[in-house]
Amino acid sequence: SLKKAYELLFKKLAEEGVFRRKRPIPDCIHRIGVISSRHGVVIHDFTKNLARLGYRIRFVDTRVEGEGAVEGIIRGVRELNQEKHGLDVLVLIRGGGSLESMQAFNNEAVVRTIFGSRLPVIAGIGHDVDVPLACMAADASASTPTATAVLINRSWAELTETLPRLEQRMLHHCATLLRGQRHMLQVQSHHLVNS
């Protein structure tokens, strides 16, 4: 059965440590490689929920279930891992579905390709009960494509909240430095006049 095969593969990959490594997702991501199907609402929801921050997106269109899905996902990860694209992170997204429809994301070759990615991988694969093995092998995972967009936006949102405070601290520091320099000039000027 699919459930038994899922459990056996999970055990095997867990023993190998495939699910342990979690690389940090870069702050303020700018260039995103996306692997998904161009058809359906998933890619639309994902891009709609990315903040308007000028992300550069390189997209690989592939089937995400059925015939050709495994090969397409592997091809997408390998293609987008090439340094010539200059990407910060890979995103693998699809909507939810049954255990049967998620088989490409429970495929050993797909899981190992994700684990072997040069770039950090975020998996945004909708699921209810059985978390796809691809999500476990990814460096970060969100339960939906929309939640994946929120995860990517988070560091930019934190930065935009922090910038005004940093600006105030910098202005205060500059004012303090200027007061100190002004005082030193006054002391030196007074010293020169009295010499």
Task: Pin down the residues of each PLM region.
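Phosphate-binding glycine-rich loops and their immediate beta-loop-alpha structural context
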Residues: 4-101, 106-117
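Charged, elongated alpha-helical interaction scaffolds
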Residues: 128-195
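Phosphate-interaction motifs
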Residues: 1
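Residue-level detector of flexible, active-site-proximal loop/helix-junction positions
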Residues: 64-66, 121, 128-129, 140
